[in-house]
């Protein structure tokens, strides 16, 4: 009897693949990697919706509630002006300026290469739209780069501090004047 197939029918299509790997010892390394897939991918494969984020054990931090946003600027003067403004407006808790990066990109059909300053901005994820709107309004580029990645883990006191510093803005839903 094909136990992998029988159990797969009972448990669902995603389980069939996993059980097939488990029934073949040579494929155990592959099966063990499958077990390391993020919960969201596994839930998508099974057809059930992913669970909502919950606070990390004991820290009170909800994964993804803080983001690191990245903005490139043509020079340090512009980067400092934008950095000071977003911190003053509490759209960000902290901005790091990383000088002398080289960006290579296509613009209007031509390959360009420029020296730029990269800003790494730490903020609440809920503030990314307001941060983006503000940066676009003051940035000298025709198309400003503003991208953000959620922070899944980190030093709990630091992540709490990011929330504290930006709380007055996130509570009102708009930036301070």
Curated annotation (Swiss-Prot):
GO cellular component entries: membrane; mitochondrion
InterPro entries: Ion_tolerance_CutA (IPR004323), N-reg_PII-like_a/b (IPR011322), N-reg_PII/ATP_PRibTrfase_C (IPR015867)
Pfam families: CutA1 (PF03091)
Keyword annotations from UniProtKB, A to Z: Signal
GO BP: any one term: protein localization
GO-annotated molecular function: copper ion binding; enzyme binding
Highest taxon of the lineage: Eukaryota
Signal peptide: 1-32
Function comment: May form part of a complex of membrane proteins attached to acetylcholinesterase (AChE).
Homology family: Belongs to the CutA family.
Subunit details: Homotrimer.
Name of the protein in its database record: Protein CutA
Provenance organism: Rattus norvegicus (Rat)
Gene (UniProt): Cuta
């Amino acid at each position: 009897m094909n136990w992998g197939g029988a159990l797969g029918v009972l448990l669902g299509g995603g389980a069939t693949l996993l059980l097939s790997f488990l029934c073949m010892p040579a494929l155990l390394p592959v099966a063990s990697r499958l077990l390391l897939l993020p919960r969201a991918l596994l839930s998508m494969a099974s057809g059930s919706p992913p669970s909502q984020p919950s606070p990390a054990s004991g820290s009170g931090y909800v994964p993804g509630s803080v983001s690191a946003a990245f903005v490139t600027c043509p020079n340090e003067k512009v980067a400092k002006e934008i950095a000071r403004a977003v911190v003053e407006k509490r759209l960000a808790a902290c901005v790091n300026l990383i000088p002398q990066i080289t960006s290579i990109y296509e613009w209007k059909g031509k390959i360009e290469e420029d020296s730029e300053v990269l800003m790494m901005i730490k903020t609440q994820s809920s503030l990314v739209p307001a941060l983006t709107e503000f940066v676009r309004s003051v940035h000298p580029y025709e198309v400003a780069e503003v991208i953000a990645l959620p922070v899944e883990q980190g030093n709990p006191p630091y992540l709490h501090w990011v929330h504290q510093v930006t709380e007055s803005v996130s509570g009102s839903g708009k930036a301070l004047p």
